A protein has these predicted regions:
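Active-site/ligand-binding neighborhood in enzyme catalytic cores
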Residues: 20, 134-262, 270, 284
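Mid-domain catalytic core of redox enzymes
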Residues: 20-21, 44, 255-402, 406, ...
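A short, basic/flexible loop-to-alpha-helix module at the beginning of a structural domain
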Residues: 2-22
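C-terminal lid/capping helical subdomain adjacent to the catalytic/cofactor pocket in oxidative enzymes
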Residues: 6, 414-417, 425-518
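N-terminal Rossmann-like FAD-binding beta1-loop-alpha1 element of flavoenzymes
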Residues: 20-50
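A short alpha-helix-loop-beta-strand transition element characteristic
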Residues: 63, 85-110, 164-168, 318-319, ...
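Glycine-rich FAD pyrophosphate-binding loop
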Residues: 42-65
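Dinucleotide-binding Rossmann-like beta1-alpha1 core, especially the glycine-rich loop
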Residues: 67-145
């Protein structure tokens, strides 16, 4: 099977040259994957129609604006080892729209702040010599007696850090994120998100830097990057500009429009029915590129998919997400992009300082702190009123010691459903059942992106699946399901900067251009 590194560029099948191929490609979803695919198609002169059910572009990579404040939902560092993605970013936005930002994250645990990734000196100082020795011995012990079951997230992390560090720095946070024990989750999530990380890596990397031995970016573990690019008005400006370019290139982008049916006839998708403001339209198509949740895609197929496929779709699960954004004086901010909250006595999982991402997201003299809560749609937190959520966020921010309650000037709530696909013990089989059905019965339906493939991809990996999918439509045979799975791809892909990558400054001292009104 061909991989992203070994494309088969055989010409398209003869059937693709008939009138059917003159129909547009319908792209479902206006997030990074969908808009990247649409841009690639439009640039090649192919007809394309994007349908996005929301009124805001970018999916989870959007920038939300309220009263002139801008929020990056989930936080999106623009760092990649994938050259075409890097080049695409700079094709969409000019150099002056990027800032170069310092990467800084910490863990709040036991009333103390720990550097993340874990640094030896800081951890020793906070844990104390005796507990640090215990953690070291615990790590050595798992080298001799590794966990019997490393197929779970718990087993995967313990095998890399030891039991004591797992309990200190991973257990509580992961249970907040997923709402279940890490022993009930697949190791796949850890393999994607912390691949290449271990206690040894965390100790050796700072020593390497202190000795002046900087790693080439092509071998750098992504979790250890020291700086990253960032659009000055947040990630949403990338996707708003991308959609504008799609339209300029002859494509069509429809907002507040929902795909309600994907019609399959004769072994392929032939049309997509969309709905907007009470009316519907059937759009004939040559291909469907879908970044809608894989569960939703299976449910809109007409005629319906078999019971086995429907059951697999129903058994895929998601974790939802909400941000409580609190406006506070600038001096109440912190230098981190975010702080992971491992304290079990508060429900917040992570706190962003939007001013540390970009001064253009906040207003002079004040900053905005994003309290991030991991929830299930319909649970107590999700259904809580905005006023009560702002009160909860204020209370927990004060409990942690970052602000006094009276410092909070205003608060806003943003809810994001289906933010994280859950890697439980059945997800892989369920995805394979759905994937196999589409490959056999509607091969011109192409799932892409995080929710489209039910894969916890980063933004760049989601974009790359879209790029490879467009190449497949044009005649190649890439295996897009290997993206962010193969070790070689994830760890050693070339990472030169690409054209136009010169940035306009670093850190909080990046040049501040006149802010737009509001």
């Amino acid at each position: 099977m061909a991989t992203p590194h070994d494309p088969d560029t055989a010409p398209a099948a003869a059937g693709e040259t008939d009138a059917f191929s003159d129909r547009p490609v319908v792209v479902v979803g206006g997030g990074p994957a969908g808009l990247t695919a649409a841009h690639r198609l439009a640039r090649a002169g192919d007809p394309v129609v994007v349908v996005e059910q929301d009124t805001v572009l970018g999916g989870i990579s959007r920038t939300v604006e309220r009263d002139g404040w801008r929020f990056d939902i989930g936080g999106h560092r623009f760092f990649t080892k994938v050259v075409p993605v890097e080049e695409f970013w700079h094709e969409i936005l000019p150099p002056e729209d990027f800032l170069l930002r310092p990467r800084m994250s910490r863990i709040f645990y036991g009333g103390k702040y720990y550097d993340y990734p874990i640094k030896l000196g800081n951890a020793l100082g906070n844990l104390g010599v005796l507990e640090a020795i215990r953690c070291g011995l615990s790590f050595l012990w798992v080298r001799v007696r590794p966990p019997k079951d490393q197929s779970t997230l718990e087993g995967y992390i313990v095998s890399n850090y030891g039991w004591r560090l797992y309990r200190h720095f991973f257990k509580t946070y992961n249970e907040k994120v997923w709402g279940v024990s890490a022993s009930e989750l697949s190791a796949d999530w850890g393999a994607q998100r912390i691949k290449g990380m271990s206690l040894w890596t965390a100790v050796w990397e700072p020593l390497r830097s202190s000795l002046g031995r900087r790693r080439d970016r092509r071998s750098q573990v992504t979790s250890l990057i020291e700086e990253f690019q960032y659009p000055k008005y947040g990630p949403g400006m990338m996707w708003e500009r991308c959609a504008e370019q799609v339209a300029d290139l002859g494509g069509e982008v429809r907002m507040a429009t929902t795909a309600t049916r994907v019609h399959v006839e004769g072994g392929k998708a032939v049309a997509v029915t969309v709905a907007r403001e009470g009316s519907s339209e059937r759009i004939a198509c040559s291909h469907v590129i879908s970044s809608m949740p894989l569960t939703a895609l299976a449910r809109v197929v007409d005629p319906p998919v078999p019971v086995e496929v429907s059951a697999a779709a129903d058994d895929l699960h998601y974790r939802d997400f909400l941000t409580v954004a609190l406006v506070v004086p600038a001096e109440r901010g912190f230098p981190d992009n975010w702080i992971y909250i491992h304290a079990p006595d508060v429900e917040v999982g992570r706190i962003q300082n939007f001013g540390s991402w970009s001064p253009y997201l906040v207003k002079d003299g004040r900053t905005c702190l994003g309290m991030e809560y991991f929830v299930f749609e319909g649970d107590e937190l999700w259904t809580m009123s905005d006023e009560d959520l702002v009160a909860l966020g204020t209370k927990e921010l004060a409990h942690i010691g970052l602000v006094d309650p009276g410092d909070v000037e205003a608060g806003y709530v943003v809810r994001m459903p289906k933010a994280y696909p859950v890697y439980d013990d059945t997800y892989r089989d369920n995805v394979e059942i759905i994937r196999r059905w589409f490959e056999e019965h509607a091969p011109n339906v192409h799932p892409v992106g995080r929710n489209g493939m039910h894969k916890y991809n980063n933004q760049d990996h989601s974009m790359y699946t879209a790029m490879l999918t467009v190449e497949n439509i044009q005649g190649a045979h890439h295996d897009i399901w290997s993206v962010n799975v193969e070790e070689e791809y994830h760890e050693t892909s070339d990472a030169r900067t690409g054209p136009g990558a010169t940035t306009s400054g670093t850190g909080r001292d990046a040049p501040v251009l006149p802010r737009r009104a509001g």
